[in-house]
Amino acid sequence: MPINPVRRSHLIAPFGVGALSVGKDGATYITAALDYWFNEEVATDKGSEIDLHEYKVEEWRLQRLLGVDHFRLPPDYRAPGNYSHEKVNMSITIPVYRFPRWHVCPACGRLEQMPLTLKAKPKCRSCQRTYMSQVQLITMCENGHLHDFPWREWVHQDEDTQCQAQLSLSKSGASTLQYQIVSCNCGAKRSLANVMWFSTDGSSTGLSTNLNRSPKEYLCSGSSPWFGRHQPEGACGLPVRAALTNATNVYYPDTKSAIYLPRRSDIAPSELVELMETSPLDDLIRDSSKSDAQRLRLHHPLILKPFTDEQIEAALKIVSNKNRKMESAVDQIVDYENFEGDLLPLEYEQLKCKQDEPQLQVQLIAIESIDEKLRSYFSTISLVKKLRETRALVGFSRVYPGSSLSLEQKKKMMFNEAPTKGESWLPAIIVHGEGIFLEFDQDKLESWESYQAIEKRVKKLVERHKVMERTRKWLHKSLSARFLMIHTFAHILINELTFECGYSAASLRERLYVSNLGGKRLSGVLIYTASGDSEGTLGGLVAMGRPGYLEPIIWKALEKAKWCSADPVCMEIGSGGGQGPESCNLAACHNCCLVPETSCQEGNRFLDRALLIGDPVSGADIGFFK
């Protein structure tokens, strides 16, 4: 295959396992399964060795919750000529397959199926000179499977057809599917009309319903071309729908991330904890059911000489507790409500405290130094001068974002064979950056939430989302007025910060801390940089969080939220119905509240600026910032 350059971070999203991408030769490729990523026979030139230690990264909380032993950075490509003295980790590539397999001649319309491993552009065997190009139609199902369009079965109206005569594709009139005709040399002809139709609930599609002449439905076979010739056994049985290769719903990556938090106690030095996890001490701790300071000193006296027995015992307790949690998580099926409940509260508490770690530096702003009008809305404002985020690819979905598949099912979609015990992994990237953390005042929030008009307004959106959960099999998500308000606030703040701090909107991300789990109510948001090098970023975002700078930015953002260029329509839709993806927004559109999808953890859903500034259409005084 030709080498197509791609950013390492893009191999997590949007070009992870099972995703389609267009190479520099114009061909469409599908990223291969994780089994092939660090395979010396597939991913490297002959004679090159792979040292995995260079790519392994640790994030203890995310490892525990996802049930893996470590994460791996996508490999970077190193051309042999630039590293002539090196023999390790040279010429590592991410294997891809040419998909879709069906090609069409632009001159004569000849259709021909090619192998997944085809390297060069094929020439038409009828024209001899013209190069064939891939067709633009594929099929997929809601379980994430992907297939070539069934050209032969479609034209013969029979999924069990035995005809192997030559096929061709022609146009008669307009370029819509209705005027594209599939023909077979046996005399069969059929247009592509209605192949992309599907019912609202997804229970039937034009392709599944109309392919066969008989009432028999054409259903998904479970095809997974990213596994190459090692296809999983067993049919899927769901209806399949046709789609264009460049359609946005062909691939939705499922990523999970965690902000680095130090593992420490008042007694155990952080360097000792790290030493126990990366040195031979870790193997000794794992292999022994009984470990104490004296036993560890007996085996490794030089390593532990600088530390006291009390420090060793404290560090041992931290590491052993982590290992037990890791072992119990291996077979865990993650419920994503619990996922957030286990991950976010600890981050929330740490961001409210001063931190001075190499990879987490937090400075608290005295709330008294904030403008008097604004300080009543917030209880904590922190400047996160340095942070590290680990972002892992957990799985993917097609047709609709989100998936009801369990964690283990998602892993099976990316691995043909599960990794051996002790070597389970998922691909991830490390992002260093900076941010601003704001915690809203709990008393003011509770007082605001008590208004019946607010509950009535949010109820419409909650009910609409419940319908989407049922019809699209989404995992349950608890929505509240608090969540919608804080989420919308994060969006307008991101949009305003782009004018002040020098970062584009796509360079900033939100991390919402809004829940009511275990009696602990979270009500905060972290706005942080989504990309940066190993040393972090330049500090422009943190500078905007200082007193005297932050207040004008927030007031400007709220002032702009009062009027949208689509008003009064935007606000009226919020009062009467819904808009945006799956109608899951109220008064929020591209002109006022939406941000790049990579910046929003909810896919630009669950927004309503009326909860910030009130509803002038109905006259309801429901704005939090009155």
Located regions from the model:
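Extended acidic/polar, glycine-enriched regions
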Residues: 189, 196-198, 225, 236
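Short, surface-exposed linear segments at secondary-structure transitions and domain or protein termini
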Residues: 158-163, 204
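Short loop/turn motifs enriched for small/polar and acidic residues
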Residues: 200-201, 530
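Nucleic-acid endo/exonuclease domains
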Residues: 203-207, 248
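Extended, well-ordered protein cores
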Residues: 1-155, 166-173, 178, 212-626
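Short Cys/His-rich micro-motifs in 6-15 aa windows
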Residues: 128-131, 188-195
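C-terminal interaction appendages of subunits in large macromolecular complexes
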Residues: 182-186
